[in-house]
UniProtKB/Swiss-Prot annotation:
Protein name from the UniProt record: Small ribosomal subunit protein uS9
Key word Signal present: no
Family as reported in the entry's similarity comment: Belongs to the universal ribosomal protein uS9 family.
GO molecular function term, any single one: structural constituent of ribosome
Organism whose genome encodes this protein: Bordetella avium (strain 197N)
Record keywords, A-Z: Ribonucleoprotein, Ribosomal protein
Ribonucleoprotein among keywords: yes
GO terms under cellular component: cytosolic small ribosomal subunit
UniProt-listed GO biological process terms: translation
Pfam families linked: Ribosomal_S9
Length: 130
């Protein structure tokens, strides 16, 4: 805990989010912008609010997020992971519910590298028998 802020780091794909939460009115600020402005798609905003909705703290915390790297989906997932860890830092009794929903586990899926001689990671050149 830093002062009266609780901290959590979240990661997803190539995105990293640093999340600070404190008791407040429910404001979520991502990279200096309100969450509704930062995430253009509704799915991104929904993903960010999932841990708060699950624990019933949707209007209880002010959240400040700094997120770098990746795209919109990766950043939303990183913010969700960070908020989850910050909530656990605030109150460890929330961990079982968050674990049950699968928010505590870091999604380890990464982009597979392109291999030499192939078009993409697994896509080969079309085979011609004749």
């Amino acid at each position: 805990m830093i002062g009266n802020w609780n901290y959590g780091t979240g990661r997803r794909k190539t995105s990293v989010a640093r999340v600070f939460i404190k008791k407040g009115t429910g404001k979520i600020v991502v990279n200096g912008k309100p969450v509704d402005e930062f995430f253009a798609r509704e799915t991104g905003r929904m993903v960010v609010r999932q841990p708060l909705a699950l624990t019933g703290h949707l209007e209880s915390f002010d959240i400040k997020v700094n997120v770098i790297g990746g795209g919109e989906t990766g950043q939303a997932g990183a913010v969700r992971h960070g908020i989850t860890r910050a909530l656990i830092d605030y109150d460890a009794t929330l961990k079982p519910a968050l674990s049950q929903a699968g928010f505590v586990t870091r999604d380890a899926r990464e982009v597979e590298r392109k291999k030499v001689g192939l078009r993409k990671a697994r896509r080969r050149k079309q085979f011609s028998k004749r």
